[in-house]
Amino acid sequence: MGTRYFLVGFLILLVLGFEVQGAHVPQQDEASSPALLTQVQESLLGYWDTAKAAAQKLYKKTYLPAVDEKIRDIYSKSTAAVTTYAGIITDQVFSVLSGKD
């Protein structure tokens, strides 16, 4: 499972790297700096959209219903356990603060 996350991260960085190499912006005068800021912002948003689309495509390609079901089961069991122990700790704190034995 760790290999899959490594592969996803590697592919996202690879896509971003190729996008950055392909977008060469020539230098402009300082008078047009708001336009430059807008171009940089649009470029970054474009990179983000490209990376997001690539990650979603990879997720859809590698989606395993059995793994998703296991994750949901583990989440529900762990939240139930945390809720139980949080209730126990809360009761203990209240009993200590109230001073009743």
From Swiss-Prot:
The keyword Secreted applies. GO terms for molecular function: lipoprotein lipase activator activity; phospholipase activator activity; phospholipase binding. The keyword Signal applies. Residues 66-74 are annotated as: Lipid binding. Pfam families: Apo-CII. It is found in: Secreted. Residues 1-22 form the signal peptide. Residues 78-101 are annotated as: Lipoprotein lipase cofactor. Keywords: Chylomicron, Glycoprotein, HDL, LDL, Lipid degradation, Lipid metabolism, Lipid transport, Secreted, Sialic acid, Signal, Transport, VLDL. One of its GO terms (cellular component) is very-low-density lipoprotein particle. Gene3D superfamilies: Apolipoprotein C-II (1.10.1440.10). Proapolipoprotein C-II is synthesized as a sialic acid containing glycoprotein which is subsequently desialylated prior to its proteolytic processing. Disulfide bonds: none annotated. GO terms for biological process: chylomicron remnant clearance; high-density lipoprotein particle clearance; lipid catabolic process; lipid transport; lipoprotein catabolic process; positive regulation of fatty acid biosynthetic process; positive regulation of triglyceride catabolic process; positive regulation of very-low-density lipoprotein particle remodeling. Component of chylomicrons, very low-density lipoproteins (VLDL), low-density lipoproteins (LDL), and high-density lipoproteins (HDL) in plasma. Plays an important role in lipoprotein metabolism as an activator of lipoprotein lipase. Both proapolipoprotein C-II and apolipoprotein C-II can activate lipoprotein lipase. Belongs to the apolipoprotein C2 family. This is Apolipoprotein C-II. The lineage of its organism: Eukaryota, Metazoa, Chordata, Craniata, Vertebrata.
